[in-house]
Amino acid sequence: MTPPAPAASSVPPETGARQQRVAVYGICEEGTGKDGRVLLVRAAPHLTVAGQWFLPGGGLDHGEDPVDGLRREFREETGLAITVGPLLGILSDVFTLPDGASLHTLRIVYAVDGHSGELRDEVDGSSDIARWVPLDQALDLPLRPYVLRALTELRGD
């Protein structure tokens, strides 16, 4: 007897190295309407995405709770202590790295309900500038694709 054909899959065929990354990000806003601002950080010059803007956050350490990871990333990238709000969603993307490897990233996105401390830029890290950006200007910046999705699909208005 011939075994049944495998079911169709949305996963691309394996042709090279495959990597997976789990990361956590926060949408931190101040004000409302035309006075609303969102906190963004800019990718540092040593990164391949230098100059692009992203939400504060980043990769989780092995075994790290996403809420703890988000608090850590905000301290590192902005100097702020945060109160993590509700989960807004999980974004998934797959793209090919310059070396040909396929990278699948799961991005856990939370609302940030509050913050304290003084905003500062990260030194010698993955970002070089942390800024409050008016919402109406944020979409005109060179944003990482997931940031555009997070700001337009996940945040409530």
Question: What would you call each of these model-derived segments?
Answer:
Residues L91-L119:
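Active-site-adjacent beta-strand/loop module that shapes the phosphate/pyrophosphate-binding cleft
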Residues C28-E29, L40, V112-G114, W132:
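Conserved hydrophobic "DFG−1" position in protein kinase catalytic cores
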